[in-house]
């Protein structure tokens, strides 16, 4: 079975600056709680109060609890953290300590070239934050998908701390055959890590690429309603 994570509110927030009406959110949760979606990524948690970003970039514990109650018991609630806002493990511990027992999963979108820095932060944070599952989204797949050795090296670095990694076509430029060939190799060579995918729709191929990755053995896929999201 392929696990589905819907990130409509989080990724769709790039269109609305994370402002969503209560009515829209209510209708969204009425629908998503009935769909075969395993995990719902509802936005960001952030201590950065600059700018005019809406509630779904600055989610608080009370609101997250309310959202979680609208999901099925077997659905997990997830949030993204803007890795650029985290300078050290103390920042991350301070931020996440407010959400233990509320958030099931946090994800970081990380440039593979900076993986060591963020893995060190996550490793230290996990010693204090025990009830949240940490995952990484590896960005810029189109830049390095031809280099299987590089991809395996990055995934191997993550293995002891991260059990699930989503590979992200940040520019939405990959083609289905490229996706199939890459995921066929990378999944078969990393059987102890759950490999997921996240495709952007710049070329109108996000759905086709997702299906190609699943056909190649990818075990987790990100989705949004109507393809709403960055790119």
What are these regions (language model features)?
Residues 1-17, 74, 127, 133-142, ...:
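N-terminal small/glycine-rich loop or linker at the start of catalytic domains
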Residues 1-53, 59-69:
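Conserved N-terminal beta1-alpha1 strand-loop-helix module at the mouth
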Residues 1-2, 36-38, 72-77, 101-104, ...:
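Short, well-ordered coil/turn segments that N-cap beta-strands
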Residues 19-21, 139-149, 176, 199-205:
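Active-site glycine- and acidic-residue-rich loops that bind
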């Amino acid at each position: 079975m392929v696990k589905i994570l819907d990130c409509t509110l989080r990724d769709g927030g790039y269109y609305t600056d994370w402002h969503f009406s209560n009515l829209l959110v209510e209708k969204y949760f009425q629908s998503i709680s009935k769909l075969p979606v395993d995990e719902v990524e509802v936005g960001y948690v952030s201590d950065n109060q600059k700018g005019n970003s809406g509630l779904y970039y600055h989610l608080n514990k009370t609101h997250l609890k309310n959202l979680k109650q609208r999901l099925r018991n077997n659905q997990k609630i997830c949030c993204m953290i803007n890795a650029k806002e985290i300078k050290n493990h103390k920042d991350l511990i301070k931020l996440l300590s407010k959400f233990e027992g509320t958030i099931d999963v946090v994800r970081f979108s990380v440039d593979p070239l900076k993986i060591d820095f963020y893995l060190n932060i996550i490793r230290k944070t996990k010693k204090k934050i025990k009830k949240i599952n940490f995952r990484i989204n590896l960005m810029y797949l189109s830049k390095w998908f031809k280099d299987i050795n590089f991809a395996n090296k990055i995934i191997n670095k993550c293995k002891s701390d991260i059990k699930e990694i989503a590979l992200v076509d940040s520019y939405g430029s990959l083609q289905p055959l490229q996706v199939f060939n890459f995921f066929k190799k990378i999944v078969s060579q990393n059987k102890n890590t759950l490999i997921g995918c996240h495709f952007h729709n710049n070329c109108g191929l996000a759905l086709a690429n997702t299906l190609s990755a699943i056909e190649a053995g990818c075990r987790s896929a990100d989705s949004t309603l109507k393809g709403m999201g960055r790119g």
